[in-house]
C-alpha cells in the first residue's frame, strides 16, 4: 500500500491532440507470465505492462522457482517449468493491489502439491473471494479465507481436484479463468458457463500455447492431461488505458487523438460501443490480428455527446471503463442511465459511490443506485475529489478537468502505478495540463 498522498492537479480546460501508443494490456500481461511459467520451453513476451499489478504476478512466479529475464522495455523471457514444475514459495505471496493475480492464482495453485498463502494490500484483502473459493472447493480444493470470505487465502497442497460443470451466477472473467486454470490439474473435464460474455484472453492464450480449449456459445471446457508449449506473445496496447484518452478527446472541443496498436478483443470493446451510441466520433483503422488477439489503431475526434440508457449487454464488456464513461456522461446532453453493474461496488473501491460523490462535488447531478447510476449532463466546476486509492477513478477525474473552468485536485493517486505508470507523461503529451505533488 502507498502511504504518501499523491495528488494530481489537472486542468483547467484544453484539448487533446497527438499520436501515441498506450502501455500493454494488463489482462494479457498477467496471463502471459502465468501460462509462460507453466509451459515447456522459453516464452518470449514483448509489450509487457511494467506496472505494479503485473510485476506482482511476476514476483509470485519467481518466488515459486521460475526464472524470468526482464522486464526490459516491455520484453520478458520466461523459462517455463511445465505444469508440475513450480516449487513451494518460502513465504506468503503478496499480490499488492491485484485482484486478477489473486483470483487466477487461487485456481492455478489449488492443484499444486504444496501449500501457499495469498495476500495483498488493504484494498485487495477487502475484495470478495468466495466467488472463486466456493467453486474451487466444489472441485475438491481446500482453501481457508477470513470469516468474511476475503484474503488471506490459505491453499492446501495435495488436493485431488475433480472437473466441474459450473454455471457462473455473475459474469466474471476472473472466475472463469480461475476455474479453467484449476481445470489444468483436475481429473476429467472442467466446463464453465457464463451468463454473459466476458473477456476471453485466457481461452485465446491457452490455445496459443497449444492447449486445446472447447468453446460452444457461452460455455467453455478444458480437459486435463495436456501440456503448454512455449510461444511468443506480443501484448497489444490496453483498451482500458486507451479509454481515458478516447474519452478525453470525445469531450473536449478541437481534440483529435490517434491511439496505436490497441487490443480490440470483442469481449473488451463495450467502451467503443457505448461511446458511439452517445454520438462519439471513433474510427477503427487497420484492424489486424496479432498472436490470436484482434488489434487496431483508433482515431477519436471531438463531437457533442448525448445521454443514453446504457445497454446491459455491454456492462461486462466495459466493466473497467465505467469510471471514465461516467465522465463522458457528465459532459453529454441529457440523462445517462446505467443498470446491471452492481459488480462496480466491489472493485478496488466502490466505484459507483466514489464516482457519484466526486461528480457531485464537481457540480454534476449524479444519483447512485444499487446497480448503477443516473447522471444528468451539466457543467463541471473545479474542486477537490478523493480517488479512494482507486487508479481508474484518479485517471477519470484527471480527464474531467478538460471541461472544468478551474483545476480539479485529485487525492490518493499513487495506485495509478498499478495499471498505467506513465499516465501523467502521456496525458501531458496529448495536451492535458496535469501536475503531481
Curated annotation (Swiss-Prot):
Broadest EC class?
transferase
Which reaction(s) does its UniProt entry say it catalyses? Answer: 3-phosphoshikimate + phosphoenolpyruvate = 5-O-(1-carboxyvinyl)-3-phosphoshikimate + phosphate
Cellular component, GO annotation: cytoplasm
Q: In which pathway does it act?
A: Metabolic intermediate biosynthesis; chorismate biosynthesis; chorismate from D-erythrose 4-phosphate and phosphoenolpyruvate: step 6/7
**InterPro entries assigned to the protein according to its UniProt record, in alphabetical order:** Enolpyruvate_Tfrase_dom, Enolpyruvate_Tfrase_sf, EPSP_synthase, EPSP_synthase_CS, RNA3'P_cycl/enolpyr_Trfase_a/b
Task: Give me the residues that bind phosphoenolpyruvate, please.
Answer: 26, 99, 127, 174, 351, 392
Q: Is Transferase among this UniProt entry's keywords?
A: yes
Q: Which domain of life is it from?
A: Bacteria
Q: Which SUPFAM superfamilies does UniProt cross-reference here? A: EPT/RTPC-like (SSF55205)
Quote any Pfam family the record assigns: EPSP_synthase
Which GO terms fall under molecular function for this chain's record?
3-phosphoshikimate 1-carboxyvinyltransferase activity
Sites binding 3-phosphoshikimate sit at 26-27, 31, 172, 174, 320, 347
Q: How does it assemble?
A: Monomer.
Q: Which family does it belong to?
A: Belongs to the EPSP synthase family.
| Role description | Catalyzes the transfer of the enolpyruvyl moiety of phosphoenolpyruvate (PEP) to the 5-hydroxyl of shikimate-3-phosphate (S3P) to produce enolpyruvyl shikimate-3-phosphate and inorganic phosphate.
| PANTHER family hit by this protein | AROM/DEHYDROQUINATE SYNTHASE, PENTAFUNCTIONAL AROM POLYPEPTIDE
What protein is this chain from? 3-phosphoshikimate 1-carboxyvinyltransferase
The scientific name of the source species is Methylococcus capsulatus (strain ATCC 33009 / NCIMB 11132 / Bath)
